[in-house]
Amino acid sequence: MSSSNNSVVYWGTGRRKTSVARVRLVPGSGTITINGRPGDHYLNFNPAYLAAVKAPLQTLGLNEQYDVLVNVHGGGLTGQADAIKQGAARALCELSADNRKPLKTEGHLSRDPRAKERRKYGLKKARKAPQFSKR
C-alpha cells in the first residue's frame, strides 16, 4: 500500500442547479484534479471558473497546502464550478470548525437555490406566452 492512503482525507459535497460535486481535500501542493483531468483543462482555462473553485481555499489562505480531488457530474461548467466551490468549503469546515465563520461570511457555504423553471402548458417557455391578439 502506498503512503498516500494513510493521509487524512476531508470530504465535502456541493450542489448547484443540476450539478453534484464530491470533493476530497488531501494534504499536498495545491493541485486541482476534476474527473481525472487537471482543473484548468477541465474548466477550459476560464478564469471565472478557476477563481470560483479556488475561492474557499484562498479565503483561508490554504491554496498551496491541499490537493483538491473532485468527482462532478450533471449540468454545465458554471454549475459544476459552483458545486465544487461549495463542496470544497464544506470539506474545509470538516477540517476545522474555526473555518466555518470566514467561509460563511464570504458566502461559500450557501446553496444557491436558483434552478431552471419548468415549462407550463399553454405557454411557449416557462413564462413566454404566445402573441396576444385582441381581435
UniProtKB/Swiss-Prot annotation:
Keyword Ribonucleoprotein included in the entry's annotation: yes
Keyword terms of this UniProt record: Ribonucleoprotein, Ribosomal protein
Composition skew (Basic and acidic residues), residue ranges: 97-115
Family classification: Belongs to the universal ribosomal protein uS9 family.
MF GO annotations: RNA binding; structural constituent of ribosome
Listed Basic residues bias regions: 116-135
SUPFAM superfamilies, A to Z: Ribosomal protein S5 domain 2-like
One of the record's GO cellular component terms: cytosolic small ribosomal subunit
Protein name: Small ribosomal subunit protein uS9
Chain segments annotated as transmembrane: none
Pfam family, one: Ribosomal_S9
Gene3D superfamilies per record: 3.30.230.10
Record keyword Calcium present: no
